[in-house]
Amino acid sequence: MKITVSVIKADVGGIGGHTKPSDGLIKAIRDTVENSGDLLIDHYIGYCGDDTHIVMSHTHGVDNEKIHKLAWDAFMAGTEVAKKEGLYGAGQDLLKDSFSGNVKGMGPGVAELEFEERPNEAFTVFAADKTEPGAFNYPIYRMFVDTLSNTALIVNKSLASGVVMNIMDVEKAQIASLRLWEDKPTIEAALMYPGRYVVDSVYTKEGEPILDASTDRLHNIAGTYVGKDDPIMLVRTQKNFPATEEVGSMFNNPHFVAGNTRGSHNMPLMPVKLNSAASINFCIPIVESLVFSMHNGKLVGPFDGFSTPDWDYIREIATKKAIAIRSQGFIHPATLVPSELEYAEGYRARMDVLETKMKPMEDDKSNSDRKENYEDPD
């Protein structure tokens, strides 16, 4: 049976700031989805920080207009409640005035896979808040490239043969299909820069879908800062794919990601329990793990993948790393480079003042001898 799993998320309002959606907002979204008739086989609704996600199973394929419109209508209903309740950032991820056939490029994040359902279909959804799509680069690399992190890359015949990894240039809206293991150095070079190059999807070499992730950057759509992109990722697990615990353990080393308060800092990505609010301790970037089984499109779960006691220790590591880097204040790399600052207009205003105070240096070197571009040390 061919099934599509669609995961669509958006930030349409938070209590007192970028914290969590209200009960009324969640109810409005749930009511809209539940009143969709027989469009869906099953669904689940939850949140990560102030982002609400809708997990849907159906038979309509990816990029289906009816499915995307349902999600759009649900988020619009949530937005109306957010406005009535005075929630912060009401509708902030809905960047267009009306639905135009597909929510991609309109603000909400989307991860979708269509596949022939296995007898024991298993998949995990990773929902993140206060960060950008490139936050998943490091965990995905560990899943499919790093044998020190994932023994399956040695002992599992399918994974050992390599996968096809589609990497997107989010600045130019271009995509490259790269193969392991022949393109390993190229993949690594791209993933060095998660602000520009992000993993869009992963397939087996036989064309079986394994992973899909949201890749839209909100400031690329809106032209100005409206919030961090808060990505979502869908990963099929078990058998010829990474095991559930192999996928989950890729988040056990809280790596530094762009995001945090005002979307302008580097901070560790903290694994948290399902339906966790965003921290008001500088909005540490967070990620949740929703583990599902599925049969004939009916969902069982989610199991809270980051709820067991061992993850409390990982959260402690993330907290200590967060405190350490925030103690550096505004000095890079605690903050992002100017081109990645989400409040760039304010920074430019400060630099304009600085520029008016700059005077030529009086020495023997001409201006033409001076290095003007300090990004390239060579």
Located regions from the model:
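Regulatory and interdomain segments flanking nucleotide-handling catalytic cores
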Residues: 1-378
